[in-house]
């Protein structure tokens, strides 16, 4: 845990001691990057941090922690910070597919000694993910994460481009609207119009690999925004992923086999900050 970086998901008070009524040392603004110096206090949930030369304690539920710093053996491929995979009905989405949507790319991470992406997830949700990772490894798998925190403006941007494709391409519209059994879904199932749980840092998109980190196949590729990605068509791999994640308290999204979220923290703020 020592040396991991994290970001605040709101204005956060720094305290001298790991309790709420301790002396106030200052306030960290939303989206600021800080360094974690210890694990959180299991009783008060306060965690020791360093920020701009100030050392103190903040409430850990208000932090998005960088996953590679704390679970380095997971495979991380944040395609929205490289070349976005978003498609619908195997059709590229103009100005989205193949684009870097987040404005950052891999950077050298001194804590783990290699280049990697920023992968923020709400601190208590990251603890749950550790449990899922442990189960996956025990069963001969690994986790491969494609997305976690997503700024709200990116959600709205991708949705607008997706809607443009949906409204102009009949083949896309057909596969987004109806599954092969004739059940209606529609575009709202595949991308949020305004707010996503990704904007709160409580959701992640992921899949499984084998023990050698070779990605296993699901019924579709990652981020294929149409009815073939719904969980009613899960293959054995997608069902195994679902079993692992739900065993640790994660909730599913019926339209996306890859998406899991922690609804107990749904009151977390909607964030727009971009990582630097």
Stretches found by the model and what they are:
Residues 1-2, 50-79:
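Boundary regions of SH3-family modules and the immediately adjacent low-complexity/disordered segments
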Residues 27-63:
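SH3/SH3-like beta-barrel superfamily modules
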């Amino acid at each position: 845990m020592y040396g991991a970086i994290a970001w605040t998901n709101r204005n956060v008070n720094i305290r001298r001691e790991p309790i709420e009524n301790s002396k106030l040392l200052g306030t960290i603004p939303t989206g600021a990057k800080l360094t974690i110096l210890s694990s959180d206090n299991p009783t008060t949930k306060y965690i020791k941090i360093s920020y701009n030369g100030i050392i103190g304690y903040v409430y850990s539920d208000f932090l998005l922690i960088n996953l590679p710093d704390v679970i380095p053996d997971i495979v991380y491929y944040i395609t929205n910070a490289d070349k976005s995979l978003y498609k619908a009905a195997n059709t590229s989405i103009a100005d989205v597919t193949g684009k870097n949507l987040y404005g950052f790319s891999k950077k050298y991470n001194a804590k783990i000694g290699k280049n990697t992406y920023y992968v923020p997830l709400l601190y208590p949700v990251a603890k749950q993910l550790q449990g899922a990772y442990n189960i996956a490894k025990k069963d001969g798998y690994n986790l491969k994460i494609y997305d976690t925190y997503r700024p709200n403006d990116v959600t709205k941007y991708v949705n607008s481009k997706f809607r443009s494709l949906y409204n102009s391409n009949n083949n896309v519209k057909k596969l987004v609207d109806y599954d092969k059994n004739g059940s209606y879904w529609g575009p709202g199932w595949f991308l949020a119009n305004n707010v996503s749980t990704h904007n709160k840092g409580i959701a992640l998109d992921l899949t499984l690999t084998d023990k050698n980190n070779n990605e296993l196949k699901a019924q579709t590729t990652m981020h294929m925004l149409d009815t073939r990605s719904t969980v009613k068509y899960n293959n054995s791999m997608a069902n195994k992923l679902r079993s692992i994640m739900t065993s640790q308290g994660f909730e599913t999204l019926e339209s996306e086999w890859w998406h899991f979220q922690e609804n107990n923290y749904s009151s977390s703020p909607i964030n727009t900050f971009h990582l630097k």
